[in-house]
């Protein structure tokens, strides 16, 4: 091979490598400033936006017409991600996704909501919006704009274009069953050639498979520079919801499921470092099964030490099971239409399915009754030093305040 050909070969390989680096970088950066600037690009102020209805079509501005066109045009090109081999994708309906979005009933959704339920949601959303606007409550990421959120931090926002819904899932807050509901609604997973109709029939391993859901972090690869604009179109039109839980009880639940049971992944990634750093164990078994047989388990105190250690997040962000809700769901950047709570799960689930107008189509799966109870807090924290409890509250204070959970005074004083 001549020197000229060799030079050209290296030039081509170098160019391909640089292009791959650019793609990887922008996928992480989130294309923060590469989108069309229309009416949806401007920040929204004032009262929450009303649910779009038939009368709103007459009020659309020229910019809104562009938004509507782009929404339909881009939605029409949506291709489902690859799913597990035994589960084939649902073929697009005639007319593609555009028909699904265009044919959706955008009429007001709260006709069957009782006055008490309406007041409760209004109070929860008012508390959330109030503290997002209140300068007295400060926490990381509070002041940043939606455009500044990296794509990697948008992976918890699941989109259902068929019913106009966006769900931000929070681990340890009934997210497995809500993911099942989203799979049924979106028809994103087939079993023997037909979409699942019963949420409980969906195998757990498919529920948590990222390829079973369309999430915001996938938009950049599909739509490039238009991804942020399309996200804003959907955030304005769709019903956005999340479910939360008392932050300390959520931590206890995460500890119970990940460290009190044999979990090989969490043992290797988290338990081994915790046991070495906070329990002074230098020689540890290779597997969780061996460790459990030898009586080597992470204590709740070790777990709290790990959370409070300033070096923990210098190595990597908190795992999603104990990461703060404000970091998972960005409630000060996204105006949620419905805030559900695990403490009122049954009532809230029924109300939300009515709001989405799918209550005749499916029921929310019955909840697991061996749930970590808030009454256990004092027992779990009894051996945790007061100073640690106070530091832990500061770490999760934003979640307590934003979602209306009372400060656990009994745990924060002698």
Curated annotation (Swiss-Prot):
Glycosylation sites: 134, 209, 280, 370
Tissues where the protein occurs: Widely expressed. Expressed a high level in spinal chord, heart, spleen, thyroid, pituitary gland, adrenal gland, peripheral blood leukocytes, thymus, lung, small intestine, fetal kidney, fetal spleen and fetal lung.
Gene Ontology cellular component annotations, sorted alphabetically: Golgi membrane; membrane
Residue numbers on the Lumenal membrane side: 27-414
Binding residue positions for 3'-phosphoadenylyl sulfate: 171-177, 245-253
Enzyme Commission identifier(s): 2.8.2.5
Record bears the keyword Glycoprotein: yes
Chain ranges passing through the membrane: 6-26
Stretch list, region Disordered: 80-125
Basic and acidic residues bias: start-end ranges: 99-125
Broad EC category: transferase
Function: Catalyzes the transfer of sulfate to position 4 of the N-acetylgalactosamine (GalNAc) residue of chondroitin and desulfated dermatan sulfate. Chondroitin sulfate constitutes the predominant proteoglycan present in cartilage and is distributed on the surfaces of many cells and extracellular matrices. Activity toward partially desulfated dermatan sulfate is however lower. Does not form 4, 6-di-O-sulfated GalNAc when chondroitin sulfate C is used as an acceptor.
Family per similarity comment: Belongs to the sulfotransferase 2 family.
Entry protein name: Carbohydrate sulfotransferase 12
UniProt source species: Homo sapiens
Gene from which this protein is expressed: CHST12
